[in-house]
Amino acid sequence: MIIKNAGQIITFDSEGNFKLIKDKSIVIENNIISDITDNKNNDDAIDASNMVVMPGFIDSHTHLAYAGTRENELYMRSHGQSYLDILNLGGGIHKTMNDTESSGEDKIFNETIKRVDESILNGTTYLEIKSGYGKTINGERRLINAIKRIKSIYRNVKITLLAHAVPDNINEYDYAGYFINNMIPAFKNDVDFLDVFCDAGAFSRKSTEMILEAGVSSRLKLKIHADELKNIGCIDLCKRFNFTSVDHLLNTRNDQLNYIKDSGAVATILPVTAFSLDSDYVNAQRFINKKIDVAIASDASPASYNSNMIFAIYLAVRYCNISLENAIKAATINGARSLKIDESTGSIEPGKNADLIILDIDDYKKLPYMYMSRLVRYSFINGIKIVDNFNLIH
């Protein structure tokens, strides 16, 4: 297959710097990018004249798998109630855990696949999907099975086992023990990562450490939600654990940045959540100045019902003190780094999987400017067309 006459091709050089190639063709053979060359043609060539070809978005942090909705919380927040206020009233994560725990696998799958389809239509070609809304081992099994069914359709899915919240009326350390003794052994062979929500209203630093130790013993790669609501010392755990990414970081102090840098973790910022919760945005440049790789992800969830990575890029450029070029890098190759898949995807270069999108714009600088428009004319996952003329192909 050939993508010919590409007006602009976005990729990155060997040092990871943004690189723009104009008026070239991309040759794809056996679902792999084989060449970027002078314009070629064949009967099946896709004409990308006056369009932008770029790596598909790597949405490296999502909570897309669940049952139920939480639209009432929008109106609660509009009347001044905070995330923690809603949580303490039995809403937030607790409501979704109850809804998901009481739902069958088919219901979870049918609701989740619709959200995944929306993400794909907006240019995502690789997804991480977390569990975490099942209170019991059976609830988590239904959730993880639903995610595995989605992976059988789209292939480019990583699964994360998430210690998300302590169910109502259960002691935190008792539940951490339940998670360690039941969840991790049951699912360690079904998932790619272990994640813990370490924050006020979730897991304390001590119980987080206990869960992470069990993850290490089970040879799981680690992630952590940290410093979203308050700074309770979770980032200090970078000194002990090898995280692939540390995510949220709204309240991370400057003196803690070296812990992230020294660990080699990717710092994932989630501007759509800041928008949805009307909270402060992360200053991404603080991390970039420390030579820390920054990723952008959607954090799509019942609290922030938006998986549009183009909107995430818009918010990052507008509010997170990051250039458009670095934001695109954060939403592609750095997202791939956070999932340990950057050797095979996240950039357009020979030898990598053909995970790419063709945008119906003539200049990449219009990407965040036109964030409310349908921009993804074509999308390819592993060289297979999944969006054709703005329509999804299953």
Swiss-Prot record:
It is an enzyme of class 3 (hydrolase). One of its GO terms (cellular component) is cytoplasm. Keywords: Cytoplasm, Histidine metabolism, Hydrolase, Iron, Metal-binding, Zinc. N-formimidoyl-L-glutamate binds at residue 133. GO terms for biological process: L-histidine catabolic process to glutamate and formamide; L-histidine catabolic process to glutamate and formate. Its main location: cytoplasm. 4-imidazolone-5-propanoate binds at residues 70, 133, 164, 228. It catalyses: 4-imidazolone-5-propanoate + H2O = N-formimidoyl-L-glutamate. Binds 1 zinc or iron ion per subunit. SUPFAM superfamilies: Composite domain of metallo-dependent hydrolases, Metallo-dependent hydrolases. It is found in: Cytoplasm. One of its GO terms (molecular function) is zinc ion binding. Pathway: Amino-acid degradation; L-histidine degradation into L-glutamate; N-formimidoyl-L-glutamate from L-histidine: step 3/3. Its EC number is 3.5.2.7. Its cofactor is Zn(2+); Fe(3+). Fe(3+) binds at residues 61, 63, 225, 299. Zn(2+) binds at residues 61, 63, 225, 299. Belongs to the metallo-dependent hydrolases superfamily. HutI family. Catalyzes the hydrolytic cleavage of the carbon-nitrogen bond in imidazolone-5-propanoate to yield N-formimidoyl-L-glutamate. It is the third step in the universal histidine degradation pathway. HAMAP family: HutI (MF_00372). This is Imidazolonepropionase.
